[in-house]
Design a protein with these regions (language model features):
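Conserved Switch II/interswitch segment of TRAFAC-class P-loop GTPases
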Residues: 79-82, 95-116, 125-127, 138-143
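Charged helix-capping and loop-helix junction motifs
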Residues: 113-119, 147-151
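Canonical P-loop GTPase G-domain recognition
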Residues: 141-198
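Switch I (G2) and immediately adjacent beta-strands of P-loop GTPase domains
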Residues: 36-84
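Short acidic active-site motifs
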Residues: 84-88, 178
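Conserved catalytic network of the ASCE P-loop NTPase/AAA+ motor domain
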Residues: 3, 47-50, 61-69, 90-95, ...
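Conserved G1/Walker A P-loop phosphate-binding module
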Residues: 1-42
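Conserved beta-strand/loop subsegment of P-loop NTPase cores
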Residues: 98-101, 124-139, 157-170
Length: 198
């Protein structure tokens, strides 16, 4: 008997050049992740995401000590960070089961981080989509402190929320640091919602 199928859509959201496509490429090329297709990336002539990056990934999911087995297919997609393409971002977010907000550690990008985060909250608050925050580019010499970043986004200066979920994930996506953990955790939150809404 074949295992039942679960399908999720995970969207990477954030300001332009914060590292969404870099996260996507790291996961797409990860040796322990099975791809169902080669992926699609629509870019401008200068290499920036015009529409979206998208790929389908497959996982075998075991729950309750191998009693319940599922096939998990995850559509991993990025929303362009360019502000002139706002309407495409809302379209890409439709049907999402979880979102990774990718922020830039450069202090000069804080206004763009705030604008993009507010925009995301406007969409996710009505849809009740779980999200996590990845603070990327932690290797920058002038990287903003975690507390300054949290204050700027008006999020609590605590490590975890009431359910024990991490508030901000540090990452250096260009070398893969923190990328897999963010992905695993947003898939976990999305699956929790999936099973509790059945």
């Amino acid at each position: 008997m074949s295992s039942p199928l679960i399908q999720l859509k995970i969207v990477y959201w954030g300001p332009g050049e914060s590292g969404k496509t870099t996260n996507w490429k790291v996961l797409k090329n990860h040796p322990r992740i099975s791809r169902l297709n080669f992926g699609m990336s629509v870019e401008t002539t200068d290499g920036r995401t015009l529409w979206q990056d998208s790929i389908f990934l497959r996982f075998d999911l075991n729950i309750k000590a191998d009693i319940d087995r599922y096939i998990l297919v995850t559509q991993l997609t990025t929303a362009t960070g360019q502000e002139r393409f706002l309407s495409t971002r809302e379209y890409i977010l439709s049907g999402a089961d979880g979102v990774v907000f990718v922020a830039d550690s450069d202090p000069e990008m804080m206004e763009q981080n705030k604008r993009s985060f507010r925009e995301l909250l406007n969409f996710t608050n009505t849809l009740k989509i779980p999200y996590i925050i990845q603070l990327n580019k932690r290797d920058l010499d002038n990287a903003i402190s975690i507390n300054q970043f949290k204050n700027g986004l008006e999020i609590p200066e605590i490590e975890q929320d009431d359910q024990g979920n991490q508030i901000v994930y540090e990452a250096i996506a260009i070398n893969g640091k923190g990328v897999l953990k963010c992905f695993r955790d947003i898939v976990g939150l999305s699956l929790y919602d999936f099973f509790n809404q059945k």
